[in-house]
Design a protein with these regions (language model features):
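PRPP-associated nucleotide enzymes
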Residues: 1-98
Length: 98
């Protein structure tokens, strides 16, 4: 993984967003790059948190906050989107049955 020179963002807190976090290796690599470039304390968000407790802990230890949606049950699932997905599926089913 490579990153451009982020010097103009030094001291600011970056927000990393990933669609799926499983082993956490991509996020951890990105966090290391941000640390080397002396950015502020990062926040991490993931749509689907499939990671093991160990992988999540390794991310949590390197960030201000690690947050995922509730599409997969996990300790970090703080963004509730299951009702939105359910409502969308019901609406789509009702529309297709007409």
């Amino acid at each position: 993984m490579k990153a451009p020179n982020l010097a103009k963002f030094r001291g600011r807190s970056p927000v990393l967003v990933d669609d799926i976090v499983s082993s956490g290796s991509t996020i951890r690599t990105a966090l290391q790059i941000l640390k080397v470039q002396k950015l502020g304390s990062p926040y991490c968000l993931a749509v689907h948190g499939l990671c093991t407790d160990r992988a999540a802990r390794r991310i949590r230890d390197r960030t201000v906050s690690f947050l995922t949606t509730d599409t997969v049950a996990n300790r970090d699932a703080g963004l509730v989107i299951a009702p939105l997905i359910a409502a969308t599926l019901v609406a789509a089913a009702a529309k297709s049955s007409l």
